[in-house]
Amino acid sequence: MTRVPFTQNYRWHLPLLLLVFCCSFFINNGAIFADIMESRNIVTAREMVYDHNWLVPTMNGELRLEKPPLPTWIAAVVEVISPDNLPLQRAMAGLAAVMLVLFFYKFATKLTGNRTYALVSSLILCTSYNIILMGRTATWDIYCHAFMMGAIYYLYLTLRQTACKWPLFIAAGVFMGLSF
């Protein structure tokens, strides 16, 4: 029986990534102090819920249009489900970081055809400081990056096809729209 190296045994890729996801984005998530950007975003979502105005985001009664609405709506839904729960707000950003890394893994696999390369690249992405910081705090940038990675992945799939695949174009457009 020939022994397959660990990195080429593809059934271990997803469990290994899941383990790194848990360590990077979810374990001991409440230990980091809330920064000013995180606080502003959560206050905006909280006002959206308490004022029952889901279309016009405000902070302290003033319009706040600097950030895209989708992450604010996600934070507002979390606020409805569990008010003042910062670890749950951060877990949503962690899920977006997981989505980013999984789309990156799929994209690297399609681009190179080498799943070991995709695993190593995804592990490097998942353990980079900026991605860990965005995935562990309730800021909006990780959502933009995750949805845009999905758009890039589906656009790449579309452009590699010989025939026009409208569902892939639509998926790329939807993910691109969600990132803004």
Where are these regions (language model features)?
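Membrane-integral, polyisoprenol-dependent glycosyltransferases
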Residues: 1-180
